[in-house]
């Protein structure tokens, strides 16, 4: 696999940083192509953070996980699509009507703003949830894997471009959907013993081998003594 392709597979999560810290980090790591902006950073900095990152020539996964009624979700997708982001996330559990409306609105918003339309991906089951929490806290009778499969199918049938799943479910989903259906996976750890706030985890190599399209990685890079080396080492590990 070419190095360029491996760099395209890593999305750096910068939510724990302010925009100044993020800029310094990205200047130290010129090979990073993708960044993830989540609720924490977007709430702190506002939409201006997108413009700043785009000026640094970064591709942006805006991970706000919209989950509401169809009209509200589609309106939100319309607005963020005008920012020129590359990927946006919505909760698949919002239902097929909301998903279809969100995808349509993202196309309309991008067209109005004359920017490329973003990929819209469905959140399946959060990787922070363990099997026990999923069944007790959420009162679910089926397994996490069964629910991920169901929500991935809902996303696919609604015309979304992919889904977010843990690396544990990536293998079975990749057997069901071709490579043009994105499987974006958090829960990636270079040190498999260090879970932090995730439960369903794998190493970068294991996740890519299972069929993940892109890996969301934060602390392993942002908290490394040498973030650029940490990023390049991860790229090398998935060759």
Curated annotation (Swiss-Prot):
This is Orotidine 5'-phosphate decarboxylase. Keywords: Decarboxylase, Lyase, Pyrimidine biosynthesis. InterPro entries: Aldolase_TIM, OMPdecase, OMPdecase_AS, OMPdecase_bac, OMPdeCOase_dom, RibuloseP-bd_barrel. The lineage of its organism: Bacteria, Bacillati, Cyanobacteriota, Cyanophyceae, Synechococcales. The gene is pyrF. Pathway: Pyrimidine metabolism; UMP biosynthesis via de novo pathway; UMP from orotate: step 2/2. It comes from the Bacteria. The active site is at 65 (proton donor). PANTHER family: OROTIDINE 5'-PHOSPHATE DECARBOXYLASE. One of its GO terms (cellular component) is cytosol.
């Amino acid at each position: 696999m070419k190095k360029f392709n491996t760099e395209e597979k890593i999305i750096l999560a910068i939510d724990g940083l302010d925009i100044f810290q993020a800029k310094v980090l990205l200047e130290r790591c010129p090979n990073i192509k993708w960044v993830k902006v989540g609720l924490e950073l977007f709430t702190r900095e506002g939409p201006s953070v997108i413009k700043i990152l785009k000026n640094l020539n970064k591709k942006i996964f805006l991970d706000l996980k919209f989950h509401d009624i169809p009209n509200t979700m589609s309106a939100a997708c319309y607005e963020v699509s005008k920012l020129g982001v590359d990927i946006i996330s919505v909760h698949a559990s919002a239902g097929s009507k909301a998903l279809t409306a969100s995808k349509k609105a993202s196309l309309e918003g991008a067209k109005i703003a004359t920017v490329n339309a973003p990929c819209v991906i469905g959140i399946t089951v959060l990787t922070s949830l363990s099997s026990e929490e999923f069944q007790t806290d959420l009162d679910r009778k089926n397994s996490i894997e069964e629910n991920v499969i169901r929500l991935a199918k809902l996303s696919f049938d609604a015309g979304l471009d992919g889904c977010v799943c843990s690396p544990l479910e990536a293998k079975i989903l990749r057997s069901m959907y071709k490579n043009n259906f994105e499987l974006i996976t958090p829960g990636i750890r270079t040190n498999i013993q260090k879970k932090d706030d995730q439960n369903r985890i794998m190493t970068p190599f294991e996740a890519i081998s299972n069929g993940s399209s892109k890996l969301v990685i934060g602390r392993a890079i942002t908290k490394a003594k040498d973030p650029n080396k940490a990023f390049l080492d991860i790229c090398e590990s998935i060759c």
